[in-house]
Amino acid sequence: MRPIAKRKFEDLEKAILAYYEEQEQLNNRRKITLRKFYPEWFQYKWQETNNSNYMKHIDGEWKRYYLDDEIIDQPIIDLTTLDLKNWARNKIVSNHMTKKQYYNMAIIIRQSFDYLVELGDLPVNHFAEFNINASLFTPPKPKEAAESVFIEDEEKKLKQIALKDFEEHPEHIGAAAVLINLSLGLRVSELVALQWKDLKDGYLQIRRMEQKQWEQLPDGTWKAYLTVVDHTKSTAGTRTLYVVSSSAALFEQVRAFNLRMGYDCEPDSYIFLHDNNRITANSIDSYYERYCKMLGIAKKGNHGARRTALTKIADNPNINLKDAMQWAGHRDVKTFINHYCYSRYSDEQKKAELEKTLTL
């Protein structure tokens, strides 16, 4: 303890009291570890995001990367910038992390420290004081077009199989949904949440989606349930799309079948039903799984159909890029180009086009 000198006894008393309060606060800070603080930050983060699916992912990251790591038992206030940088680099290298995986993993420690700074329990967030050399990250493996989209011949055969299935078994409403979405390119969560009021004058409004939500049980495990929420994945996801005539006809066939079965077709009624219940995203993907198996091609689900439709739109020189992105429900050009622009030609078609283009 440093010497304290004051002229008045009352001032000396206050100074001594302030000193011991400062020491007590410092001692309390030294007791804060990530293991002790994580539950408090987790509840704060849940209130901030109100997204149980995201919070389950966070909890999974905690169990995978933090729970058995000695850093969570070290006093946070004692961790230096160099300590944290070395820890982060070791995590990246030992787990062969991509850049995206690292930033997802680091959310817990970075934002926990931010919250401690806000609370006044940490003077500065040292985790925000360093950068990671990009060469440490494992490059993400690019997906081949054959894994991501239905090439032209595959799409043609897929349509034939789905149409035959729906014509022979009209109760297989998922077959109609597969056909319709090849011209819409919706997220599967948007597709299964469509209601009749969304379809008007040849256009379709996208404004809700199916969402898997999670409840954390007292023992720390998670229980899933499905619900429909009145919003899309992002604000860009709320959009109005033109319905081509062939899909409009299919919608009417679905409506006719629903009425024949005695199902409601009121404005608030769901379009795609099975046994008078809304079909789910998993149900749609089961149709794709069956069709791909019948075709003898790599397994691709609704997202492959979405990529296929959006790639076709992007390939059309008469459709503006911004219009294509609006159709997709995206605002970021990089995301759209990287994830929704693929070649749909077979190797033989590519060779033929190259011969035409590059022959001397």
Regions found by a protein language model. Name each.
Residues 163-169, 257-267, 275-278, 282-333, ...:
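Short, basic (Lys/Arg/His-rich) helix/loop patches that form interaction surfaces
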Residues 114-125, 179-216:
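Short, charged phosphate-coordinating catalytic segments
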Residues 103, 118, 129-188, 192:
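Basic, Lys/Arg- and aromatic-enriched nucleic-acid-binding interface segment
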Residues 21-24, 39-97, 101, 114-115:
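Basic/aromatic-enriched alpha-helical hairpins
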Residues 1-28, 234:
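Short, surface-exposed polybasic/aromatic micro-patch for ligand or macromolecular engagement
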Residues 193-253:
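Conserved tyrosine-mediated DNA breakage-rejoining catalytic core shared by Y-recombinases
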Residues 64-65, 95-134, 187:
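N-terminal DNA-binding recognition helix of tyrosine site-specific recombinases/integrases
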Residues 210-212, 328-353:
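Catalytic-site neighborhood detector that most strongly recognizes the C-terminal catalytic loop/helix
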